[in-house]
Amino acid sequence: MKFGNFLLTYQPPELSQTEVMKRLVNLGKASEGCGFDTVWLLEHHFTEFGLLGNPYVAAAHLLGATETLNVGTAAIVLPTAHPVRQAEDVNLLDQMSKGRFRFGICRGLYDKDFRVFGTDMDNSRALMDCWYDLMKEGFNEGYIAADNEHIKFPKIQLNPSAYTQGGAPVYVVAESASTTEWAAERGLPMILSWIINTHEKKAQLDLYNEVATEHGYDVTKIDHCLSYITSVDHDSNRAKDICRNFLGHWYDSYVNATKIFDDSDQTKGYDFNKGQWRDFVLKGHKDTNRRIDYSYEINPVGTPEECIAIIQQDIDATGIDNICCGFEANGSEEEIIASMKLFQSDVMPYLKEKQ
């Protein structure tokens, strides 16, 4: 079993941005002592939904502040920045950490990011393909050249070279069937969303396994990750109550930050996300409290026994034994770390790989 901790860097109303950044560093350091293998950092821009615009920089700090902790991105919006610049950043982190960096990537969801950074969102899928292929070439060969409709430059040497053979491990944040297939065609592990239930996770893995097998990959050796919103307390109601205020503000901030729901009909390739939002509305999840209640049904929020049951059900259904939890909804920094420690002592030891 492996365990990760993802850090949202959401700015709740009661915290300043300086306090959020300080908490990010403290929680990252605390994760190493609480039995977590990896900390995952999210990329967001221009909104309190997430203050971390450059996870590479934050990863460098946390890798330097810890000794054994892996630090990953969940995820870099790959199409919005130059692939060579990003490949240099990844290799630098891989070298300086001696292989402790994890490179999580995604295609991107927010129209605002593409507009500000000057990337055509309609081309996001093609750019994702192109950028990844170029970066993979650089990681493997030490050189990159490009001559296609998206980018042109002569052969250059990628410095520094990768520390890890083939480059830092790559993960894909995957929600849609098309992204699942994209990852499977390349044998890349997925980070599965915390907003889907066990049945949906199993269906996503079945699709992945079918496509990956067709492309010659051994699916038993692919290190997928399950993600969760997590709160552990010996009092189940207290665990849920302490999270509700944070999650309410966080969900509302997400809706406000996301342009795709109200003006993305002209954007190609995002039908899954628009359909997902329609499903949320039909289920009543547009109402924040109902959405939080549903989140509690499918995420480990409650007593240690309740948390174990929810996670173990997903492990048994999917075979995934890499568990990534987010604890920031638990209140103050002290309360967050207390929940992390209780997860370490009363949940981690009792989770078992699928038999």
Curated annotation (Swiss-Prot):
User: Which SUPFAM superfamilies does the record cross-reference, listed alphabetically?
Assistant: Bacterial luciferase-like
Query: Which InterPro entries does this one have?
Result: Alkanal_monooxygenase, Bact_Lucif_Oxidored, Bacterial_luciferase_CS, Luciferase-like_dom, Luciferase-like_sf, Luciferase_bac/NFP
Query: So what does this thing catalyse?
Result: a long-chain fatty aldehyde + FMNH2 + O2 = a long-chain fatty acid + hnu + FMN + H2O + 2 H(+)
A single Gene Ontology MF term assigned here is:
alkanal monooxygenase (FMN-linked) activity
- Write out the entry's keywords from A to Z: Flavoprotein, FMN, Luminescence, Monooxygenase, Oxidoreductase, Photoprotein
Gene Ontology biological process terms in this record: bioluminescence
Q: Name one GO cellular component term.
A: cytosol
Please tell me whether the keyword Oxidoreductase is annotated for this protein.
yes
EC number(s) recorded for this UniProt protein: 1.14.14.3
> Any idea what job this protein has?
Light-emitting reaction in luminous bacteria.
- Subunit-structure text: Heterodimer of an alpha and a beta chain.
Q: What else is known?
A: The synthesis of this protein is regulated by a complex control mechanism that has been termed autoinduction. In fully induced cells luciferase comprises up to 5% of the soluble protein.
Please report which protein family the annotation says this sequence is part of: Belongs to the bacterial luciferase oxidoreductase family.
Please give the name of this protein: Alkanal monooxygenase alpha chain
Q: Which organism is it from?
A: Vibrio harveyi (Beneckea harveyi)
Q: Which gene encodes it?
A: luxA
